[in-house]
Amino acid sequence: MIRLVLIAILLGALNGAGQDDRVSRLKWMSGCWVRATPRFTMEEQWTVPRAGTMFGIGRTTRRLVSADSVSEHEFTQIHLVNGKLVFSAHPSGQQPADFTESELTDSSVVFSNSQHDFPQNVRYMKGRADSLYAAVDGTVGGSTRRADFRYARTACEK
């Protein structure tokens, strides 16, 4: 009986480890990223994968004459649901939405939700050690739209 319990515990641990490994394939996303222009700064910060999940936060700051102003923010989570990665987005001023993994490689991931208004796809691609590419795309009113974002690695503020 003890042997059966130990085998069950071991199999459960191995199953969980495999799921954690799936999220861990996105470790290259972890860290702090910035995209700056004269008019705005976009920042994303991703935690290191742990316990089958990653958390992210994004902020867009617009440069105004008198001061900077946060115009948008988003809280995100990447986690496992039924063996697939799910990107859960909570953007400011919009309803939360889940996007399910449709493609995963060692250097890119695509999350899709064909029922979402826009975007229907969220993509992250590993660049060089100091860059991260992101894109959102989909169809709006019968027209295809896409927005691409290139981020540079930056030091995480303490």
For each feature predicted by the language model, list its residue ranges.
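Sec-dependent N-terminal signal peptides
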Residues: 4-13
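Edge beta-strand at a domain terminus
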Residues: 17-19, 106, 131-158
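N-terminal helix-cap/turn-to-beta initiation motif at the start of protein domains
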Residues: 18-32
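Central antiparallel beta-sheet cores of small beta-barrel/beta-sandwich binding domains
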Residues: 35-115
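Short, low-complexity Ser/Thr-rich regulatory SLiMs
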Residues: 48, 80, 126-128, 153
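A short glycine-rich beta-turn/N-cap micro-motif
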Residues: 50, 54, 128-133
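Well-ordered alpha/beta subsegment
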Residues: 106-113, 117-126, 133-138
